[in-house]
């Protein structure tokens, strides 16, 4: 069986609701195959919760107004569609909003049952005057994708129940691009960059994980045709060479002198793990980084039980004969 190199997936968090995922290296052509499948699944098949119908006290249908309420019922329904929900229940549940007196009615004024969470409590629903009263009963259900109000209408609905367009999908935007990446001497491998933006109801990381789980289940149907059929096997995940948690500690924690610290940061060395991957000669090649700085770094690392990377060409400058060793700090 052919064995392909296992791709790696990394996440770059741009904000709590947007992340950029990079998957590489992929066999030529698989960037578009995987990217298109993930995008379509993320936009259409991630489960979520939404309001499916409402009952508004004093309103028999959406083409009416309420006394003491600035917005008409149609505008109130549009605002209700903007409520972002999560629900632990597979069956429909009910929540209520009761508001009176002058002020703004927002999603945070709704009283949801246990297991239902409103992710954007600041969502505006209506504006009430001094004599305004607003009482709404919401029906919340779980689903996928988008369901128009007509499909949420039931034949046995009581008079006054108004169906609402349901936007179940917790994913707002998905885009991807494919770039070339290099593996040894080959430069035709794919690098997939997937940009995902979600509602507060779910994180981009969980959304991508859900999409991946869905695709695995669906593609597994094809494998069931012949479980012994030969395909391309993905190699094992690479084993990390260093699992010491101190490798991720920033070099600021070493309390180096300002000169040494500035030299390392200018060279792009930000963590202890990056520092110990360099040899003494690597550091000496940094401008204004001399033996005093080397000794300081070695002393700080020694307190952590660490050391710089050894070099086969290392030599002891203290034993040089017939010459004088010069470092920038001797200036």
Curated annotation (Swiss-Prot):
<comment type="function">
    <text>DNA-dependent RNA polymerase catalyzes the transcription of DNA into RNA using the four ribonucleoside triphosphates as substrates.</text>
</comment>
<dbReference type="Pfam" id="PF01193">
    <property type="entry name" value="RNA_pol_L"/>
</dbReference>
<dbReference type="GO" id="GO:0006351">
    <property type="term" value="P:DNA-templated transcription"/>
</dbReference>
<dbReference type="Pfam" id="PF03118">
    <property type="entry name" value="RNA_pol_A_CTD"/>
</dbReference>
<dbReference type="GO" id="GO:0000428">
    <property type="term" value="C:DNA-directed RNA polymerase complex"/>
</dbReference>
<keyword id="KW-0808">Transferase</keyword>
<keyword id="KW-0804">Transcription</keyword>
<dbReference type="InterPro" id="IPR011260">
    <property type="entry name" value="RNAP_asu_C"/>
</dbReference>
<comment type="similarity">
    <text>Belongs to the RNA polymerase alpha chain family.</text>
</comment>
<dbReference type="InterPro" id="IPR036643">
    <property type="entry name" value="RNApol_insert_sf"/>
</dbReference>
<dbReference type="InterPro" id="IPR011263">
    <property type="entry name" value="DNA-dir_RNA_pol_RpoA/D/Rpb3"/>
</dbReference>
<keyword id="KW-0548">Nucleotidyltransferase</keyword>
<dbReference type="Pfam" id="PF01000">
    <property type="entry name" value="RNA_pol_A_bac"/>
</dbReference>
<keyword id="KW-0240">DNA-directed RNA polymerase</keyword>
<dbReference type="InterPro" id="IPR011262">
    <property type="entry name" value="DNA-dir_RNA_pol_insert"/>
</dbReference>
<feature type="region of interest" description="Alpha C-terminal domain (alpha-CTD)">
    <location>
        <begin position="243"/>
        <end position="331"/>
    </location>
</feature>
<dbReference type="GO" id="GO:0003677">
    <property type="term" value="F:DNA binding"/>
</dbReference>
<dbReference type="GO" id="GO:0046983">
    <property type="term" value="F:protein dimerization activity"/>
</dbReference>
<dbReference type="GO" id="GO:0005737">
    <property type="term" value="C:cytoplasm"/>
</dbReference>
<dbReference type="GO" id="GO:0003899">
    <property type="term" value="F:DNA-directed RNA polymerase activity"/>
</dbReference>
<dbReference type="InterPro" id="IPR011773">
    <property type="entry name" value="DNA-dir_RpoA"/>
</dbReference>
<dbReference type="InterPro" id="IPR036603">
    <property type="entry name" value="RBP11-like"/>
</dbReference>
<feature type="region of interest" description="Alpha N-terminal domain (alpha-NTD)">
    <location>
        <begin position="1"/>
        <end position="226"/>
    </location>
</feature>
<protein>
    <recommendedName>
        <fullName>DNA-directed RNA polymerase subunit alpha</fullName>
        <ecNumber>2.7.7.6</ecNumber>
    </recommendedName>
</protein>
<comment type="subunit">
    <text>Homodimer. The RNAP catalytic core consists of 2 alpha, 1 beta, 1 beta' and 1 omega subunit. When a sigma factor is associated with the core the holoenzyme is formed, which can initiate transcription.</text>
</comment>
